[in-house]
Amino acid sequence: MRPTGGRGAHRGVWQFGYMTTDPVHRSVRLERIENSRYTAINERGGKISIGTGDGTDFTPVELLLVSIGGCTAVDVDLLTSRRAEPDSFEIVVAADKARDTTGNQLTDLLVTFRITFPDGEQGDKARERLPDAVRKSHDRLCTVSRAVELGTPIATRIE
């Protein structure tokens, strides 16, 4: 079933049951490879293996952490590398997986930035810009972090 009208209506080509040309619409699909193993495929053909953590495949929780880290990495890199290219750039995203009477959840989510810049005036400018870039990514720019923090509703549909 294809969405019609309202927020689900887009102009373009249908792929994976959704439009692909709308610049604000995003879609991925998952294909089952075997019991508890899947391949996620984006609209551009990129693939990621997903599993339960028994092998090297990413778990869904790890992919959420990757999404948060990747989103903020792009923001912070764009805002700071205008001043100077980093000497090193690493972001670590960690959380505790908890279970209570309401179900599974993540707690104590922490994003740690380990970024260094070269010595000199341009590196100094990038270092000075870093705290503001991190704040802007967290407060406004990172769609993934904002969706998690704001509690974006998730609808489901069976076709």
Regions found by a protein language model. Name each.
Residues 12-66, 76-159:
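Extended beta-strand/beta-hairpin segments
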